[in-house]
């Protein structure tokens, strides 16, 4: 999604009304319930949230010059810098060491990379298809990508073939290197 | 409550992922300078060994054969990345900045700064600073070769040159040539040659 992305893709940049900001916050908490305890720390009431509309109907939400989360369709997707601050709040999957290289260059994650001994998937009942997951790596502390499940985690375990996760945002991509100033 | 993650100053990733960017040598030096604790944690305690393979990073379960393959590929990537950097640096050092003074109407002239695009300088921002610094109009325009250049109104070539020198030095590009060309006739000198000396 952010293979090619630069300042030229920005259309408008406006302040978000506080009422909208409130509803955004509650939506975030709804999506990631564990965020509730820290949401006020991440997004204090007085901060000025900005919405940045970009091409391809992507919307970024930023505080100051840091993009915190973005939206393509319905769901809000946190950026990696946001995830790094409070990783516990997000559903996480783990890939093995062999896959890191490919994910960092933007590839989708294949099922075997999620089921081998170095990888980890949440226990049953697992996560449903299309949910947003944070991708962590073996022996690493911080997340390296944000993705969307192309099949449910149970399916990944049983089928174990083909694309498992679509990589949306990864370390070192254009959104990661993107700065508003 | 919130975690604070250190990001590598060279490749901007969390330091544990530096090995995958192919810039690990410079990343290690940076980390050693900035966060000794994390450095020891990631790369072990041998502080001098910058080239060595990161032993602790390598713990994994993907089997020796695949690990070896991965290592090879990473080394290749590193070599490629390094040669790319060197090429880039050479290109930067061999290129030059041209400051041209051009005539407008009558006694007015403007200064055109070309050749900055190699140095990753934000032209628009530079134009803005010029405009406020010298209190003139300043803009970015495209020249005949479709390359961007900064156009400053007013006869301030020397001041602009001094500023650009400082800017390049800040970026660690001190050896870059900055050349000044005068495309406009200097009006002050012409009368002394044409008019006969009073006698």
Swiss-Prot record, chain A:
Alphabetized UniProt keyword annotations: Cytoplasm, Protein biosynthesis, RNA-binding
A molecular function (GO) term: RNA binding
Family classification: Belongs to the TMA20 family.
UniProt protein name: Translation machinery-associated protein 20
Species of the source: Eremothecium gossypii (strain ATCC 10895 / CBS 109.51 / FGSC 9923 / NRRL Y-1056)
Compartments in which it is found: Cytoplasm
Reported function: Involved in translation.
Ranges of residues in domain PUA: 90-172
Presence of the UniProt keyword Acetylation in the record: no
Gene Ontology CC terms, in alphabetical order: cytosol
SMART domains, A to Z: PUA
Short name of one Pfam family: Pre-PUA
Subunit-structure text: Associates with ribosomal complexes.
One record GO biological process: ribosome biogenesis
UniProtKB/Swiss-Prot annotation, chain B:
GO molecular function, one term: translation initiation factor activity
Iron is among the record's keywords: no
Organism domain of life: Eukaryota
CC annotations in GO: cytoplasm; ribonucleoprotein complex; ribosome
InterPro entries for the chain: DENR/SUI1_TIF (IPR050318), DENR_C (IPR046447), DENR_eukaryotes (IPR005873), DENR_N (IPR048517), SUI1 (IPR001950), SUI1_dom_sf (IPR036877)
Gene3D superfamilies membership: SUI1-like domain (3.30.780.10)
GO biological process assignments: formation of translation preinitiation complex; nuclear-transcribed mRNA catabolic process, nonsense-mediated decay; ribosome disassembly; translation reinitiation
Compartments where located: Cytoplasm
One family name in Pfam for this protein: SUI1
Domain SUI1: 97-168
Key words of the record: Cytoplasm, Ribonucleoprotein, Ribosomal protein
Entry similarity comment: Belongs to the DENR family.
Subunit structure: Interacts with the 40S ribosomal subunit.
Domain notes: The SUI1 domain may be involved in RNA binding.
Name of the protein: Translation machinery-associated protein 22
Source organism of this protein record: Eremothecium gossypii (strain ATCC 10895 / CBS 109.51 / FGSC 9923 / NRRL Y-1056) (Yeast)
Classification of source organism: Eukaryota, Fungi, Dikarya, Ascomycota, Saccharomycotina
Gene expressing this chain: TMA22
């Amino acid at each position: 999604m952010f293979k090619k992305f630069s300042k030229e893709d920005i259309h408008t940049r406006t302040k978000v009304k506080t009422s909208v900001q409130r509803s955004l916050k509650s939506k975030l908490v709804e999506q990631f319930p564990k965020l509730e305890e820290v949401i006020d720390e991440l997004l204090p009431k007085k901060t000025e949230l900005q919405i940045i509309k970009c091409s391809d109907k992507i919307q970024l939400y930023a505080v100051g010059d840091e993009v915190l989360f973005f939206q393509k369709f319905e769901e809000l997707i946190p950026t990696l810098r946001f995830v790094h601050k409070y990783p516990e709040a997000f559903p996480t999957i783990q890939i093995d060491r062999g896959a890191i290289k490919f994910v960092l260059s933007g590839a989708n994650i294949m099922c075997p990379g999620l089921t081998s001994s170095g990888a980890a998937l949440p226990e049953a009942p697992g996560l449903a298809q299309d949910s947003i997951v944070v991708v962590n790596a073996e022996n690493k502390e911080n997340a390296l990508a944000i993705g969307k499940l192309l099949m449910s985690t149970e399916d990944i375990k049983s089928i174990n073939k083909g694309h498992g996760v679509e990589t949306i945002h990864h370390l070192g991509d254009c959104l990661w290197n993107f700065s508003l100033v | 409550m919130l975690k604070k993650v250190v990001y590598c100053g060279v490749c901007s990733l969390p330091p544990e992922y530096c090995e995958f960017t192919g810039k690990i040598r410079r990343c290690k030096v940076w980390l050693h300078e900035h966060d000794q604790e994390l450095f020891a944690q990631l790369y072990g305690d041998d502080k001098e060994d910058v080239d060595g393979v990161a032993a602790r990073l390598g713990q994994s379960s993907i089997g020796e054969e695949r690990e070896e393959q991965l290592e090879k590929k990473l080394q290749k990537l590193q070599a490629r990345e390094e040669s790319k950097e060197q090429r880039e640096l050479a290109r930067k050092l061999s290129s030059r900045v041209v400051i041209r003074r051009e005539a407008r109407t009558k006694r007015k002239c403007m200064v055109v700064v070309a050749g900055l695009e190699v140095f990753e300088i934000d032209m628009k921002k530079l134009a803005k600073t010029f405009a406020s610094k010298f209190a003139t109009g300043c803009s970015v325009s495209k020249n005949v070769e479709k390359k961007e250049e900064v156009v400053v109104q007013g006869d301030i070539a020397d001041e602009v040159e001094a500023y650009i020198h400082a800017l390049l030095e800040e970026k660690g590009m001190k050896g870059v040539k900055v050349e000044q060309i005068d495309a406009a006739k200097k009006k002050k000198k012409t009368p002394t040659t044409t008019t006969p000396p009073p006698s």
